[in-house]
């Protein structure tokens, strides 16, 4: 699971290493599942993939039960992933709707793993949305090469939107236990640098 997250989200992977082993393990399982669903949309390559995916899915369900993830989060995430099967070019409205599942729901799951109360969900969604938007900016050329256009060519609009959502999300930082805030702050710093390099 650790290896999958390192490959799938190396920026965030580097940041989470400060967290306790139990939290890291659960986050690895979460991100492995996110990757599996993404790969399912792209297609199954082999019987080996199916066996590996089954293990990932089983471990994710253990994490989901442990933290009582809401069914709506999973539905929104799956909906966003399967949107990629038929929608290749997004407007601002459809991109933000995509973020609802691809990143906002993941933000809520992360918040539960970190021990945050439901009151933190609004801020977790804003932070997840911010991260997704700046990832779209960073990966623009790669996504275009795959036939996807999540954002328009004027990246300054999306960089501003990233900053606005990051600021809003950070208003809920106090919901995260103080000893667990470091990796979030480190991730923010990394993504802010991406924004500065892209602006």
Roles of regions detected by a PLM:
Residues 1-131, 137-199:
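Catalytic cores of Mg2+-dependent Asp-rich isoprenoid enzymes
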């Amino acid at each position: 699971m650790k290896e999958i997250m390192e490959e799938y989200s190396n920026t965030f992977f580097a940041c989470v290493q400060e967290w306790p082993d139990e939290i890291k393990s659960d986050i690895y399982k979460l991100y492995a599942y996110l990757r599996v669903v993404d790969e399912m949309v792209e297609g199954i390559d082999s019987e080996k993939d199916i066996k590996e995916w089954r293990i990932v899915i089983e471990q994710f369900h253990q994490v989901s039960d442990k933290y009582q993830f809401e069914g709506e989060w999973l539905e929104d995430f799956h909906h966003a992933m399967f949107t990629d099967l038929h929608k290749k070019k997004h407007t601002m409205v459809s991109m933000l709707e995509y973020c609802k599942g691809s990143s906002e729901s993941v933000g809520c799951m992360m918040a539960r793993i970190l021990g945050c109360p439901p009151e933190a969900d609004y801020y977790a969604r804003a932070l997840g949305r911010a991260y997704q938007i700046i990832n779209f900016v960073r990966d623009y050329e790669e996504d275009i090469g795959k036939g996807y256009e999540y954002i328009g060519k004027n990246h300054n609009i999306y960089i501003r939107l990233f900053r606005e959502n990051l600021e809003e999300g950070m208003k809920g930082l106090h919901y995260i236990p103080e000893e667990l805030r470091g990796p979030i702050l480190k991730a923010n710093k990394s993504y802010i640098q991406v924004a500065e390099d892209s602006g």
